[in-house]
Every structure is written in structure tokens, then in C-alpha cells.
Amino acid sequence: MKGTSEVKPMETHRKLLKPLVEKRRRERINNSLEKLRIFLSQTLKSEKLKNPKVEKAEILECTVQFLQSRKLLPLDREAVDKEYQSGFQHCLETTLHFMNSKPDMNGVTKELLSHQMSSCKPPSDAWSPTCAPLTKHVPSLSYQDSTPHLVSNSISISPTKTLVDSHFTYQTFKTWRPWV
């Protein structure tokens, strides 16, 4: 008798919880479909997708057609390269602006970073989405991580800074963990 009375509250709890879980799942699906409908209506300029009452199956069919058409389109390498170059140039300009706004930055460090960034500027006639090889690097040695650092012919300029020459080898440092 005792076993059956303990099972009933659990079954009741599951029966009450199941509709709530299903309702949340349907809400997530509907929210995602609505976002997809809006994205596709803006991207495809489709009149039928502008209607908020469009069928879910129609949204999914348009999505499949859109993805298939994107797969069949040839990749415009020149446009991709120009977009990459534009983003790269924007990052360089933002970094230079940041460096120039920091009056407390060491003059040698600022000069080395500016030199490095100028060597990364792509030539305008033959652009490929790669940066020139690093010539100087100023790592902070306040802690060590597991990512490989380019190290060779190091010249110490302060207890926490190191200048690195243009011939690099990979050196992996021990991972810093706060709980160790």
C-alpha cells in the first residue's frame, strides 16, 4: 500500500509538468519560425512571407529553397576579398586610434605596435586575405596560458615585457589556472 501512495504524487507531478514543457517547446519553435520568417522576408523581399499568418510549412519550404539557392551560387572571390580587406582595414584603424588615445603607453611599445600594424597593411594591387608575417610582438608575461606563443631571439625591455625578433618558433606555456 505504501508504494502506491508514493508513486501517485510523482505521476501527478509529471502529468502537470508535461503540458507546461510542451507549451514552452511550442513557444520556442514558434519564436524561431517567426524570426526565420522575418529574416527571409527581409532577405528575399517576398510578399507572402510578410504576412505574419503564413503557414509554418511555407516558412520551412522558403528556408530550404533559400539555402539551396545559396549553395548553388558561385562564390564571388573578389567581393569576399574586398569585404575582408575592408574589415581588416577597419580593425587596423580602430587599433591605431586606441593606441593614440593612450598617453600612458610606453613610447617604444607604441612605436613597435605601429610598425607591426603598418607591415600588415595589404598592398592595394594584389590583395590576399592574409597578414604579413609578424615582425615584432610584445606579449604580457603576467600569466602563462596554453596557447602557443611565437618566441625567438627575445630582448627583455622590462620585467613583464619582451621584444621578439622576426624568426619565430612555437613555444607552449603551462596553463594558468586560478584554482592551482
UniProtKB/Swiss-Prot annotation:
bHLH domain span: 13-70
InterPro entries noted in UniProt: bHLH_dom, HES-7_bHLH-O, HES_HEY, HLH_DNA-bd_sf, Orange_dom
Disulfide pattern: none
Keywords: Developmental protein, DNA-binding, Nucleus, Repressor, Transcription, Transcription regulation
Orange domain segment(s): 84-116
Cellular compartments annotated: Nucleus
Tissues in which the UniProt entry reports expression: Expressed in the presumptive midbrain-hindbrain boundary (MHB) as early as the early gastrula stage (stage 10.5). Expression in the MHB continues through to tailbud stage. Also transiently expressed in the eye anlage at late neurula stage.
Function per UniProt: Transcriptional repressor. Represses transcription from both N box- and E box-containing promoters. Demarcates the prospective midbrain-hindbrain boundary (MHB) region in the neuroectoderm in early gastrulae embryos by repressing transcription of a number of target genes.
Free-text comment on this protein's domains from its UniProt entry: Has a particular type of basic domain which includes a helix-interrupting proline.
Quaternary structure (record): Transcription repression requires formation of a complex with a corepressor protein of the Groucho/TLE family.
Protein name (database record): Transcription factor HES-7.1-B
